[in-house]
Amino acid sequence: MNRTLLKRMIVTSVIAVLGVSTSFAALVMERDQSVDTAPSVGMYRFEVPVELQGTYNSAGVANLTASMEKEPNTLSMNVAHVKGNPSESYVVEIYKDLAAIEAHRKSDHYQAFVNEVGSKLTNRKMYDVQSVLLFEKKDALSIINDGKAVVTLTEFTVDSNEIDTVQRQYQLDMERAVRDDAGYKAGYVLRERNAKNRWYVIQIYSDQAALTKHLNSPGYRFMMSQIQGSLQGVTTKVLDGDILVNHGGQSFVRP
């Protein structure tokens, strides 16, 4: 299948669920179609009405765990909500390629999720992002509503002259943390497709103690000393991890 046609089909499917604006849809479908061999990523924000939160969680567990069981090219699926505000939910998905996204969208478990809760989510936002860095433990991860997992979502703009330095420093810190810190489960860095110096850093921890350990580590402190002057508009949201699953073993660095 033609890659451009496949991309249009996938975006159309996502739009049907998320209800994003037609202008944004046009932007996504007409964007640069050059081949990107990096793993494909999706990032979304939803407002989940209080009365839907239980169903949203149970339907999400069924969808994401089935994906891990049946879709080898669906690499990572993560759902987390803002600490203290279960209505604000974030989803980060990582796939081997566009064909893997299409396979997931066509699956019975995804369609069941859409039918149960898709149209009831509000204030939806779809981020148009690409992979920069993806690091995971070698072993598969499965954290389901354990009440302890913590996810941080940090957003910032990188000085355009310092992108390589910032990427390298994050790479070194994430590689070390994944290797040496038992409670550091995964680190993902994404960038906006059409504003490549706008970055999102997602880091997954087993619990608050693991987050605190990482923030106080010499490696993290050294990284920040090297890059903090190159970052603007830094904001961090601390999220409670709801559903965090992956096959493990990702170690991607964008050239």
Regions found by a protein language model. Name each.
Residues N2-S13:
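Bacterial N-terminal signal peptides that target proteins for export
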